[in-house]
Amino acid sequence: MSQTDTCMSFLWAKKKEQNGRFFWLPLTLHLKDTMGVMDFLWHHWVSEGQKEIIIHALSDTGEEVVDTAQRLACFLAGIHDLGKCTPVFQTQKGYQNSPDLDIALLNRLEQAGLTGISSLNLDMAPRKRSHHTVTGEYLLQYFGVQQDIASVIGAHHGKPIDKEEVVTKLKLYPRDCFQDEKEGPCQRLWLAMQKQILERNLKKTGFIDSEENPTVDSLPEISEIGQVLLSGLVIMADWIASNEAYFPLIPLEENEPEAMENRLQCG
């Protein structure tokens, strides 16, 4: 396993302490859960009328436009929490857990190559400025995704984000997304993880070039009404995938559920 894969496997999306035991939800697992829920919603819940609106909102007009709409919905679900792959999120303290859980998660990232992450001091101002919806939209634009699609990620907690706020403010605070202000091993590792999450989701949903390499250039353009509907679907998929009764957190010492293949079906 590469350093990027190892470090990425230790990123958390959710964490809690219950009856003295530590539990967490790996970020990569939560993204898989949410994409799986979105696929189910598209095939079993979204009405034909809603699908038609989304389809007509796309720039694609070919015979495969229906497939493109479904793949785009799944891509957005699988990338919705990209903003959690940032130091400003990973250093957040839990509200109701022992500091030992926060420390344990940070120590694993430190040992995987993010030198200094366990002692990184980002005050509360960046947390308000750099909510993971904001950093998610910013990172997608950083990697070349157009604003129409990136804005869906920025809105997945119910509030669209002003483009100028996303781009201008975060450019001034590179530590929020990349840990260091200048290029170095930690900044390169964060960029590698963020890019890998993006590219794996592009490839999984079929947004590839003629040589089957993932590319943001294969993503369609989408009108405002389509953005609104897709934002709503991402919110719903995320809400369902965040329900611990259906998609429980796992013990801290585990990296994925023992019955991974049954997780989505049970959910």
Map each language-model feature to its residues.
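Accessory nucleic-acid engagement/destabilization modules that flank
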Residues: 3-8, 12-19, 27-41, 45-267
